[in-house]
Swiss-Prot record:
The keyword Lipid biosynthesis does not apply. This is Aspartate/glutamate leucyltransferase. Functions in the N-end rule pathway of protein degradation where it conjugates Leu from its aminoacyl-tRNA to the N-termini of proteins containing an N-terminal aspartate or glutamate. It catalyses: N-terminal L-glutamyl-[protein] + L-leucyl-tRNA(Leu) = N-terminal L-leucyl-L-glutamyl-[protein] + tRNA(Leu) + H(+); N-terminal L-aspartyl-[protein] + L-leucyl-tRNA(Leu) = N-terminal L-leucyl-L-aspartyl-[protein] + tRNA(Leu) + H(+). Its EC number is 2.3.2.29. Its main location: cytoplasm. Keywords: Acyltransferase, Cytoplasm, Transferase. Belongs to the R-transferase family. Bpt subfamily. One of its GO terms (cellular component) is cytoplasm. It comes from the Bacteria.
Length: 239
């Protein structure tokens, strides 16, 4: 049985309608693969290629009937062309170092994660994560996840990019970094590193998750060109 057949046989469940977190006035529905289903690195890789996304042990995709604004976006790393702002970012971080680490608990990482969420989501439930929730969100036991650790010239932690290794690329799960250093553009730096790392590993893509045209929170993803979006069951190139 091929992997596409296995995907079609996977039990998938839909949530009820809920407020869309990205588009004001819109409702959303999400399809989740049964978290108790038997998964493997190969099957997960194929789901990523079919426009799915991982959060902890949950694999999901948008399932809205009336709206198809959410599209998976990936960067073909061998065709990627850096722009002036990307080169400025690399210059600003010329002294930074990156080390791939196993996805295990480190107190320094967890504290940075808390600082990042408190800056991005002040006053919300997300801003005070428990240690167990932190690790459950970033990793799972049926795929290989690395924590790419970014440090500055003085060995001070700058950020962490939780990244899944899939068959044809790297999937950016979540990146958190120091919120007090906007001049370094650390989120952009992490993606540029993932692009170069995928090239070094002989992989083809960096998967950045979902993108919505016109959504300010996701605008940065489309800044990496060319990129591809998953639309109508196939990947389409956006130059």
């Amino acid at each position: 049985m091929g992997r596409n057949d296995l995907i079609r046989r996977l039990p998938v469940y839909a949530t009820g309608e809920h407020d869309c977190p990205y588009l004001d006035g819109e409702t959303a529905c999400t399809w989740f693969v049964d978290p108790d289903a038997s998964l493997s690195p190969g099957l997960y890789s194929n789901l990523i290629r079919q426009g799915y996304r991982r959060s902890g042990r949950y694999i999901y995709r948008p399932g809205c009937d009336a709206c198809h604004a959410c599209q998976s976006l990936r960067i073909p790393v061998h065709r990627f062309r850096s722009r002036r702002r990307h080169r400025r970012c690399l210059k600003a971080n010329a002294g930074a170092t990156v080390e791939p680490l196993p996805s295990t608990y480190r107190e320094e990482h967890y504290q940075l994660y808390c600082d990042y969420l408190q800056a991005r989501h002040p006053g919300s439930e997300m801003s005070d994560p428990a240690i167990g929730d932190y690790l459950e969100f970033l990793r799972t036991d049926w795929c290989e996840t690395l924590f790419y650790e970014f440090r500055d010239e003085n060995d001070t932690l700058l950020g962490v990019a939780a990244t899944d290794l899939v068959a044809d690329g790297l999937s950016a799960v979540y990146t958190f970094y120091r919120p007090d250093l906007p001049e370094r553009s650390l989120g952009t730096l992490a993606i540029l590193w993932q692009i170069n790392e995928a090239r070094r590993l002989g992989l083809d893509y960096v998967y950045l998750g979902y993108w919505i045209k016109g959504c300010d929170q996701m605008r940065y993803k489309a800044d990496f060109r060319p990129h591809e979006v998953f639309n109508g069951g196939r990947w389409l190139t956006v130059a």
